[in-house]
Amino acid sequence: MISSLHRPTLAKVDLSAISENIEQVVSHIPKKVQTFAVVKANAYGLGSNEVARYLEQTGGVDYFAVAVCDEGKELRRLGITTQIMVMNPEPGSYEQIMSNHLEPNIFNKHLLLDFISAAERYGAHLYPIHLKWNTGMHRTGFDEDEVEEVLTILSRTGAVRVASIFTHLSVADEPTEDDYTYRQLAMLDRVEQRLRRALPHPFL
């Protein structure tokens, strides 16, 4: 009779290899492009604390990204000072996000209005937020036809500012779908141009 289906398994993580991978990526992009290292879910099992510490010491990344506020708080507790985006800011976590100098990903109107209200109550001024746009992944993100509404909401407050905009390229790793990827990029470019004409502050 089998007493257990579990076997002892050990994964050895070469942190220098992660850093070298980032260097390879950075070598193929313009210098003005900033790099985000996604360390959510314990850095996908590699150890978020160890990975973040190492990457902050060696450089090469401009931001870390985590899934929820608690992950970002833990990195701050460990002394990580690099900017951190929270990709799924939970209701009720907004004050903790701001007190820990984390930056929320905002992907719908309800979330935008809620975070602005929290930022105003907190006394924030031009607090950095990131806007995600749906260009074809159809999970989360503002649609292109919401640009004017987003701008109207932002024009009514000084509590937040847009730090960056981004999208999720759904099939970028499939060369046969390059046309779809280019359409996604074209949509994001249209959104970017409209936002740059209207917003008073630069963004990524």
Listing of model-derived features with the role each one plays in the protein:
Residues 2-5, 9-17, 33-203:
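Active-site-proximal beta-alpha core segment in soluble small-molecule metabolic enzymes
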